[in-house]
Regions:
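Conserved SAM/AdoMet-binding glycine-rich loop
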Residues: 1-109, 114-116, 141
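Catalytic palm subdomain of template-directed nucleic-acid polymerases
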Residues: 119
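C-terminal accessory regions of radical SAM enzymes
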Residues: 122-211
């Protein structure tokens, strides 16, 4: 980072690694190093990051050294779905991290997904309620996307085994790149139709930005 600043005049650094920070001690040491050099730049965590090691002290240190943007990826507001997709995160920790981040005036985005293969309507409504709660807490942006099975994931293998995914070609990968298309429909949920999922997504986005 210091090399990029001195040689190229870099003013902002984006950390695209989803697991950039896994230990509190590393976060604090990184922030101290920025202050000791000293380096003047802003930095972001725009791709989603783990929150287990982040507390008020960590987020205060991050903000004081130029961290302006924090993206969290709880994925679902349903504990049942979090267990199904093996997402080892507690929603209570997400809410706590948001509170601390907003106290530091950070821009906070949260990513959510609906339409997992075994998801039920009750799970979707829990996710929509979580999105609305994010809005009330001051979260600046939300990504509410329909589930897309990525090759190599357990859910992708499951869908191949059940015959839901048959052909992998250029159009399949193109579909993975249009997550923000509100008209996009999911074809992988066993309990909810694509049209109904698209409706839920629209309701969620309107509710978040409407409040």
């Amino acid at each position: 980072i210091e090399h990029y600043i001195n040689r190229y005049g870099a003013q902002n650094i984006d950390f695209m690694d989803l697991t950039a920070f896994t230990r509190k001690s590393w976060i604090m040491e990184f922030c101290r190093e920025i202050q000791d050099r000293p380096l003047n730049f802003t930095w972001q965590l725009p791709s989603g990051t783990r929150v287990e090691q982040m507390d008020g002290e960590c987020l205060a240190a991050m903000a004081s050294t130029g961290c302006m943007n924090l993206t969290l990826a709880p994925e679902s507001g349903s504990d049942r779905m979090l267990k199904e997709i093996k997402k080892k995160v507690k929603l209570s920790k997400i809410f706590e991290t948001i509170r601390h981040a907003k106290q530091q005036r950070m821009f906070v985005k949260c990513n959510l997904i609906i339409g997992f293969p075994t998801e039920r309507r009750k799970d979707v409504w829990k996710t929509l309620w979580t999105s609305l709660r994010f809005s009330f807490m001051g979260v600046d942006d939300v990504g509410l996307n329909l589930f897309s099975p990525y090759p190599g994931s357990e859910l992708f293998s499951y869908l191949q085994t059940t015959g839901k995914i048959k052909k992998i070609d250029h159009s399949y990968f193109e579909d993975l790149m249009v997550l923000q298309n509100i008209r996009r429909s999911s074809h992988f949920c066993e309990n909810i139709s694509p049209l109904e999922l698209s409706f839920y997504r629209l309701v969620g986005l309107c509710s978040f930005y409407g409040f």
